[in-house]
């Protein structure tokens, strides 16, 4: 019997596939609106007017009404069961890059599965395969030069981390596949030639002798970290910024000529050469980069900021592994793997966010790993959207530091209706997580929640005659402990929700230590 319960419960678990950060190397859909994105692992956020694009471990989520409802694209003939690693929007077209892990000889290898784009707000999609090279594509004409180029013939370690747009060109950063561009909506792709590790700048009229390749091997001995693509930005100046494992490359002629900035070639340099993100503050046009330690002994993790396009840099938040930035009229926000930070003085001073708590739902964000940021501001609303490994968060920015209202959007993988319930994550481990019991009432009432073991013995009363509102999603939590505060043993447990205005609700929770 216990084995049967285990199978039923495991079938409801939502995948939590996190986008890796290392550099080792046309069909119609009909979608119902959901209350939240389908996954709690949020890797990318982009906002265009009232539209919010969210890349998750369970496909793409789109809101066309500022986050009030969501259309989720996952487990269908277009997105299948792929995760989304990058999102973009240009001239009415929505773009999403997809990926997954493949197990090779016992190791999980990040593998690209291409792009999807829609010109009609997600009603129809075009699928673009992951760009790879023909084995014979071993050279590139660059100005007066014929550059040797390692053909990238596999999708493994070749997945799209970022998307940018320049005029009618789509640019992608594809990890081991480098930086690529397309001028025909992804039908064909060309490799972008960046400086090798031993050169700080290149232009087509230079006489050059190097290979475009990220790793050494049978093709040649060169292994250029600057040919591993991670991040992209098209700034308001029209300059293109390309972040790699070897620094920040800047082009002022549409991606033809490049100047490279790294930790060693400037008097006031970036902190590290592994560039996970590049963003522009739209208010003062400053450039912000998530600059991680790569291979240099003196490199360090930090945020690097430039007021002059990259000629010199200021370094902030030393030691933090930042993944994204958000900008409001009064503040700069940084999302790191160990916290969320706000600065009101252009980066000189940073303040960590307090424990994030949704007062209305009575839930606390169960992670410190922040992945993505985007802001929405107009005369009536100032909103910071936050992607984490524990859900999507909407923060209504307040008048002082972290004084606003938090709204945590947790996905359960199922839609809730009146007088229904669901527990997640399920299974869960009390030493690292809490079990969220999500339910809704048809009307206001008092609620009691009890936990029972497999023999129907009372383990803990989680809630006793607590007042709860009707017609909204409610979440209360069980920490996996009994009335004495001891962590319970492995096994199946049952919850019972009694209400003053309806029939009891029941469900199962599997505890695994």
What does each model-found stretch correspond to?
Residues 492-513:
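C-terminal tail/sorting-segment detector
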Residues 18-32, 59-77, 112-132, 180-192, ...:
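Asp-box/BNR beta-propeller loop motif
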Residues 371-420:
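Blade-level signature of beta-propeller repeat domains, shared across WD40, Kelch, NHL, RCC1
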Residues 47-49, 89-91, 165-167, 234-237, ...:
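Residue-level detector of Asp-centered blade-edge/turn motifs that repeat once per structural unit
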Residues 28-32, 75-78, 127-154, 193-223, ...:
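Surface-exposed loop and turn segments in beta-propeller and other repeat-based domains
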Residues 458-488, 499-505:
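Glycine-centered tight-turn motifs at strand-turn-strand junctions
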Residues 415-424, 428-450, 503:
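Glycine-centered coil/turn sites that cap beta-strands in beta-rich domains
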Residues 29-61:
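Beta-strand-rich domains and repeat architectures in extracellular enzymes and scaffolds
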